[in-house]
Amino acid sequence: MNSLENLILVGVIKSCHGIKGHVMLKSFTDPATKILERNLVNESGANIHIKLISQNAKGELICTFNDIATRNEAENLKGYKIFCLRASLPELEEDEFYIADLTHLPVLNQDHKEIGKIKNILNFGAGDIIEIEFSNQTTELLPFNKEFFPIITKDYVILNYQREA
C-alpha cells in the first residue's frame, strides 16, 4: 500500500463516453498520451489498466478502463483519480517541479515573510496559473512566471507582487 506522498496525480476520469464502458480521461501529463507510458495505480496502490481508444480535440483521452464494459459501470467512475508512483517519474531539470510538489508550499514576500500558501495550480490552455490563498483568507490568481515568482524552491516560493489594499 502506498501513501499519497509517494503518488503523483496524473489524471482523472471526467465522464463516461458511449455505451461500451469507455471513459473520458483528463490527463495531467504533457503530452496527454504520456500517461499511458506509466504504471498507473489508484489511491490504494492497486494497478489500473487503461487502453487508448482515441483522443478528442481538447486533448482528452477516450479509453477503456480495467474491466469496465457498460455505460452504467463507467458512469460510476466520474471523478476517479489516477496516480503513478513518484519513484517512477523522470528526474527534473533544476527549474522544473511537479504540480504536487508546489501545491500547499508557503508563499513568501520579498522580505521572506510568509504571506500565504499555494492553493492550486490551474491551466486553461494559455499557461499555468497559481492560485494563492493569502493569510487573510483571500485568494488571487497569478500567472506562473519568473516575473511574479522569481525564486522557487522545494520549500517555498517568493512572490514579487504588491497586492492592492
Swiss-Prot record:
InterPro entries linked to this entry: PRC-brl_dom, PRC_barrel-like_sf, RimM, RimM_N, RimM_N_sf, Transl_B-barrel_sf
Domain PRC barrel: 94-165
A GO CC term assigned to this protein in UniProt: ribosome
Keyword field contains Disulfide bond: no
Keyword Ion transport in annotation: no
SUPFAM superfamilies: PRC-barrel domain (SSF50346), Translation proteins (SSF50447)
Keyword set, alphabetical order: Chaperone, Cytoplasm, Ribosome biogenesis, rRNA processing
Cellular compartments annotated: Cytoplasm
A molecular function (GO) term: ribosome binding
GO biological process: ribosomal small subunit biogenesis; rRNA processing
Predominant subcellular localization, coarse grouping: cytoplasm
Domain of life, source organism: Bacteria
Assigned protein family: Belongs to the RimM family.
Quaternary state and interactors: Binds ribosomal protein uS19.
Function description: An accessory protein needed during the final step in the assembly of 30S ribosomal subunit, possibly for assembly of the head region. Essential for efficient processing of 16S rRNA. May be needed both before and after RbfA during the maturation of 16S rRNA. It has affinity for free ribosomal 30S subunits but not for 70S ribosomes.
Domain description: The PRC barrel domain binds ribosomal protein uS19.
Listed PANTHER family: RIBOSOME MATURATION FACTOR RIMM (PTHR33692:SF1)
Name of the protein: Ribosome maturation factor RimM
Originating organism: Rickettsia conorii (strain ATCC VR-613 / Malish 7)
